[in-house]
Amino acid sequence: MKATSYPMWRVIPMVWLALGVCAPYASGQAVLNIQQATLMEPDQKTPEIATEELRKILAEQSATVFDARPFNEYAVSHIPGAVNVAAKPGVPSSLYVSDVAAIGRVVQDNKAAPIVLYCNGPLCGKSKRLAEELLTAGYTNVRRYQLGMPVWRALGGITEIEAEGVQYVREKDQTAVWIDARDPEEFTAHPIPNARNLPLSGVKPGKDVGEVKKAKDDGRLPMEDHNTRIIVFGRDGAQAKAVAEALAREAFHNVSYFAGPLERLRTAAVR
């Protein structure tokens, strides 16, 4: 059944964002744009960062960004540049929290290391639980991107999929659309089963132009359900990422790309 309304799990964060953006305006302060918005929750033990700041952190590699979700969720789609660690032992799934000791190994036990956490958005508690455990362990520079994955995607962010995620989606999600970003000659000579070709060479700057417009019109892209999972791969990660970014600009908000070599994806996809 095709979706007929915007998913509530996306509506709720966007409403919260609207409240965050409008509040400064109502009080006479400078108006923020949506990329600069946070939840502005009172009495939080760790500060939040906005989407704009997270993008800057990722570009500059000025902090270690941790995906605070279980590995399988991370493997299927995560913010590019984020890392993931194992779960804290002995904790039930309902109270999932990452292992602080494993985080320590990533940051070489530097308690002053800049750390950013994210999870499944405004209503997800994983980042807050992990932040509190890090503070208890003595870490002093912990921030949260509490808007998380839903708002990252809603604001045009793409995600990255791991080989384990490729295998999972192949087995579990028959609605997923697989986009091959290679040139038509490569696509034809060495195809990936069930993939659709949308070559980067045909992608043009702007909206509704070039090969992307053609793919909308000829059925290669899921125009009647923009919630559909789209996974982009190519000759290499750079090629795949460029096409994924082009699709995200066209309001497809569930777009992931595979950053590894093509043969690794092929192996994962045909297991």
Question: Which role does the model predict for each range below?
Answer:
Residues 2, 12, 16-51, 75-117, ...:
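Rhodanese-like catalytic fold shared by cysteine-dependent sulfurtransferases
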Residues 54-57:
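Post-signal-peptide N-terminal segment of Sec-exported extracytoplasmic proteins
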Residues 65-67, 178-180:
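Structural scaffold elements adjacent to functional motifs in cytosolic proteins
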